[in-house]
């Protein structure tokens, strides 16, 4: 039950972080898509972990089962840590792509603005 509450709290935290990041940047549409993709990945990973955790509820409450439960939780924590690290790396790569795309987008916007001025004036 504790692992379920912890995993649910993580899902909510990642969703909140994802939402707050898109509100403070200039790349709203593109970043919203990427944040949404990351949030979906986090949610899927956590739901998978929750499914595994719910399977553990069938274990009896003996010392041996408690040890198995603890081993399983440690394994789940390591898997989640690896998934989060991978997602952070992907997020950093997306950030680099955005840095590369931003000057091009600004230049294109300037060109379009200039064309509109020429047509109107």
Curated annotation (Swiss-Prot):
It holds the Pfam family Latarcin. Expressed by the venom gland. Keywords: Amidation, Secreted, Signal. The modification Methionine amide is found at residue 120. Residues 23-69 form a propeptide. InterPro entries: Latarcin_precursor. It comes from the Eukaryota. Residues 1-22 form the signal peptide. The keyword Secreted applies. It is found in: Secreted. GO terms for cellular component: extracellular region. The keyword Transferase does not apply. Belongs to the met-lysine family. Shows no antimicrobial activity against Gram-positive bacterium B.subtilis B-501 or Gram-negative bacterium E.coli DH5-alpha at concentrations up to 20 ug/ml. Shows no toxicity towards insect (S.carnaria) larvae. This is Met-lysine-1a. The lineage of its organism: Eukaryota, Metazoa, Ecdysozoa, Arthropoda, Chelicerata.
């Amino acid at each position: 039950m504790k692992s379920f509450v912890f995993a649910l709290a993580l899902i909510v935290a990642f969703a909140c972080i994802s939402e707050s990041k898109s509100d403070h940047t200039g790349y709203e549409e593109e970043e919203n898509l990427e944040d949404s993709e990351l949030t979906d990945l986090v949610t899927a990973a956590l739901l998978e972990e929750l499914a595994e955790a719910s399977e553990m509820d069938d274990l009896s409450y003996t010392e041996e089962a408690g040890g198995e439960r603890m081993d399983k939780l440690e394994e789940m924590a390591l898997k989640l840590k690896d998934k989060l690290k991978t997602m952070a790396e992907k997020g950093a790569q997306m950030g680099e792509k955005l840095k590369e795309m931003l000057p091009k987008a600004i230049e294109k916007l300037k060109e379009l603005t200039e064309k509109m001025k020429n047509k109107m004036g």
